[in-house]
Amino acid sequence: MAIFISHASALRVLMSPRLSSLVRYARLADDDAIALKSEPSAIDESISRLCVLLGISEIELGRLDLIVGRGTSRKSTSRVRYHSWSGPMPRGAFLRISDGIYLSTPEFCFLQLAGSLPMIDLLLLGMALCGSYFPADTERGFVDGSPTTSVRKLTAFLADAKRCKGIDQARSAAAHLVDGARSPMESSLLLVLTLPRTMGGFGLAKPTLNGTVRLSDGARAIFGYPILRPDLLFPGAMLVIEYLGRAFHKDPERDIRRELALRHDGFDVQFVSIGQIMDSRQLYEIVKRVASATGKKMRPASAAIVAKRFALIDRLIPKRENILDGECLRYERTWWALPKCLA
């Protein structure tokens, strides 16, 4: 009897560096062969097989999220949490990782959690899935990785999903995502700058995150490499925003060369620190500069908009007590983050 791993359990398998080789070689399951049935009597054996397959203990696996069809016995236990699915199954919903063991794809996980996560949390999840990091219970607060999906793939998957819980919120969130973030701070900064005013953002144009800039010969001589990847790039405005986080303090000379190379090729460079983001006056000056460069007219914000903006920044930006020496950050751990044993 097959099991279909879903929700947070599926995310942890998908995003764990320890399990990346298993996921890398998994193939999409045949949509016509999917039948969401799990016999309770066969679950114990399936969990044991899954632990052997993953090379982890049942304690490391944690309580397993499984998705089942409506009408299937689904009394949750200390080992298993069942989730009912009654709508049509979207195409590309599962990866087959072994005989009888299926894993929800990143796109399907996003849809599953859209029914329960607040919008901002869903946006942060989407940015991580489309980026090259994932929140984890580690000192940094995240692990590096490779993108498991893209905004294009996620949007296409959600377009195919019909009549299911969370679909409207998932589609709304996907419209605000951008590929390529390398850290939670990049995602947070992007959302503050680009989300609509009605959601607390500044409504600026979406930049490219960590996109490739090919340097001229002169700029290459300065930087030492033919290309560089700015944190936030507004291509039409020739504007770059560089976040001064932990990497800057490790190698400030390299960042200075980056700035000189970009300016040599005509880019305007704006540096941003966590302190500036937390200071409303400094943040607004940065926003005005981006708006001017991109041709965005800034309208006065009502009291309601200002309140939403403060609430958004309070949710996305680490508190002052979580800023460590050298502007290193300690992020609040989300419940769907990787546990330490899988990071």
Predicted regions and their residues:
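Short gly/ser-rich loop at a beta-strand->alpha-helix junction or flexible surface loop bordering the NTP-binding
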Residues: 1-165, 197, 301-303, 310-343
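Surface segments flanking catalytic/ligand-binding clefts of nucleic-acid enzymes
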Residues: 146-343
